[in-house]
């Protein structure tokens, strides 16, 4: 989020009792781990990786600002560089190497329906793929074996 907008987002979150907010501060190590496997589209990953680095720079003070405002966030965030090109292998590797704490994997799983077909998003085909990745037996097995707890932002707000 742009630095000038983040204080406004925090004020609105407090005003409307929203206890947690996304901070798009993507760690390079997590981005690298998630980029593994499959047939990678290197030009897309390069472009989106540059965007992720830019967002990381813009978000460098966001965590401290959110803490001062009493708004929770995840400890780690990843997935921007892989938007639309997420792979099962990358998700598996990420799950196997998660750091201690909470990590948001930003993705867009879903079904392609008539409403989605009417939009001008390049993420139409990848939604079904990401849904299949996240519900894949091998991915679910890693989650269970490693004791990974799947949560949402509501949990973050309650845990604070």
Model-derived regions, located:
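Active-site pocket-lining segments that scaffold enzyme catalytic pockets across diverse folds
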Residues: 1
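Terminal accessory/targeting
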Residues: 7-160
């Amino acid at each position: 989020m742009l630095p000038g907008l983040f204080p406004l987002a925090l004020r609105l979150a407090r005003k409307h009792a929203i206890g947690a907010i996304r901070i798009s501060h993507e760690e390079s190590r997590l981005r690298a781990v998630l980029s593994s496997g499959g047939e990678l589209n290197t030009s897309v990953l390069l472009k989106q990786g540059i965007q992720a680095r830019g967002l990381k720079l813009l978000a460098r003070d966001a965590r401290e600002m959110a803490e001062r405002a009493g708004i929770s966030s995840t400890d780690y965030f990843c997935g921007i560089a892989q938007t639309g090109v997420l792979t099962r292998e990358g998700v598996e590797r990420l799950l196997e190497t998660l750091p201690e704490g909470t990590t948001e994997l930003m993705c867009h799983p879903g079904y392609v329906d008539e409403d989605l077909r009417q939009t001008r998003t390049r993420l139409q085909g990848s939604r079904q793929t990401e849904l299949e990745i996240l519900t894949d037996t091998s991915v679910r097995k890693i989650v269970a074996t490693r004791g990974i707890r799947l949560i949402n932002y509501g949990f973050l707000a309650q845990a604070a």
